[in-house]
Amino acid sequence: MATTATCTRFTDDYQLFEELGKGAFSVVRRCVKKTSTQEYAAKIINTKKLSARDHQKLEREARICRLLKHPNIVRLHDSISEEGFHYLVFDLVTGGELFEDIVAREYYSEADASHCIHQILESVNHIHQHDIVHRDLKPENLLLASKCKGAAVKLADFGLAIEVQGEQQAWFGFAGTPGYLSPEVLRKDPYGKPVDIWACGVILYILLVGYPPFWDEDQHKLYQQIKAGAYDFPSPEWDTVTPEAKNLINQMLTINPAKRITADQALKHPWVCQRSTVASMMHRQETVECLRKFNARRKLKGAILTTMLVSRNFSAAKSLLNKKSDGGVKKRKSSSSVHLMPQSNNKNSLVSPAQEPAPLQTAMEPQTTVVHNATDGIKGSTESCNTTTEDEDLKVRKQEIIKITEQLIEAINNGDFEAYTKICDPGLTSFEPEALGNLVEGMDFHKFYFENLLSKNSKPIHTTILNPHVHVIGEDAACIAYIRLTQYIDGQGRPRTSQSEETRVWHRRDGKWLNVHYHCSGAPAAPLQ
């Protein structure tokens, strides 16, 4: 929208300091208001790279956050648009994640878990009173106001939150984090406020024993468990939990959303409002130990996803945050060829990166937030829930990564080490079958294969790239994951095919993309003859 003068209110009123977190199109930095010296966290969104739909989502997030003023919610203090950037000024919360704080405590009891869920329910009740559904309640979004003992729990990240009409149920799209999704969302039924209560039930279960009620490495099996409400209270860890706590979990994890307890009702449950007499005060050391392992798994898997972005079921997976690639068959004049196959339509497994980081944290959930709908809560659209409109600039950058990856593979097929080195960083790191599981750094290891095998190969090689998934990481980094089929003629003149699952991390320096890390599983990419 055209304006006569450029707004500089954020620049005038606030001073920026160190970075606290970063996303694809946003960065979070500590800032201080010049007139009061009060500290805040500024989420800075690069609006030049946002599509019209992303602008709608940004406006919705700001609109929702402006409504919510509660001691257990990270508060939005200001929303400012300047030329090319939008600033969301939030509370600066310094206590870290609730779950990380619990494992550092010397004493933790059922009563403490009750106090935690009480605060979470207070925040959920407040947003539900304002006809808001969070849709992404999980440990990463439960923060502590400070590092002081007894600091308030704060609910963060309203990037997936939606506005609803009272108790009315509707289909707002498939969004959330797998382990915390409700049965009605998985069934693609109309849903509403009860989805947040289901997630609270999962969180409460973890708070009491340190592990989740539903878990399976196979996401399809995980979803089957959730839809069936297949959880229990196994011995011995649940033997010391009071019946009242189990009763509240059962009411929260009720499959039928119409019969599920509400936030207001849960706040009146004896285990919550009469914790001093109902909840056990016994120290739960086993829970702390299990929760420590649970946190470690979350961080480890989050780190792996952040750097590798590869699915265990890669050939069946479909990242529905990415539209189908536009590339067709790429024919080369050389003896090698690279053929790009667009993404599969297989819907058995879904792997998606988090669409937006929490405004005040950087940790990622191992079961990352997934969004598979076109409207993402913008009501009135009849578009398919399996498509997403992407920013045009983002599409162009993804195509750039696919193209440069094809060029690199063509250089390998042609045995052209000079062309290969121009596309790779001199300090390229790699995990590949030829290195027997060792991390290789630099070009010498690869040079051996170029000089002794690839450059001497006169037989044709044809490569097909299947299901390329490109993830843009900030302005100058990207990751591509794909399956590579290599067809070649062996020493006896027989046609052969080898398959490998590959990931390449790219970094742009001085306007040029360089491959900085490579990960390969399966058969060697360069077939031995």
Curated annotation (Swiss-Prot):
Residue ranges annotated for the Protein kinase domain, each copy included: 14-272
Annotated positions of the Phosphoserine modification: S311, S334, S349, S352, S455
InterPro entries: Ca/CaM-dep_prot_kinase-assoc, Kinase-like_dom_sf, NTF2-like_dom_sf, Prot_kinase_dom, Protein_kinase_ATP_BS, Ser/Thr_kinase_AS
Mechanisms controlling activity: Activated by Ca(2+)/calmodulin. Binding of calmodulin results in conformational change that relieves intrasteric autoinhibition and allows autophosphorylation of Thr-287 which turns the kinase in a constitutively active form and confers to the kinase a Ca(2+)-independent activity.
Localization in the cell: Sarcoplasmic reticulum membrane
Calmodulin-binding: annotated segments: 294-316
Membrane topology, record value: Peripheral membrane protein
Polar residues bias: start-end ranges: 342-352
EC number annotated for this UniProt entry: 2.7.11.17
Annotated family: Belongs to the protein kinase superfamily. CAMK Ser/Thr protein kinase family. CaMK subfamily.
Complexes and interactors: CAMK2 is composed of 4 different chains: alpha (CAMK2A), beta (CAMK2B), gamma (CAMK2G), and delta (CAMK2D). The different isoforms assemble into homo- or heteromultimeric holoenzymes composed of 12 subunits with two hexameric rings stacked one on top of the other.
Protein name (Swiss-Prot/TrEMBL): Calcium/calmodulin-dependent protein kinase type II subunit gamma
Organism: Mus musculus (Mouse)
Gene (UniProt): Camk2g
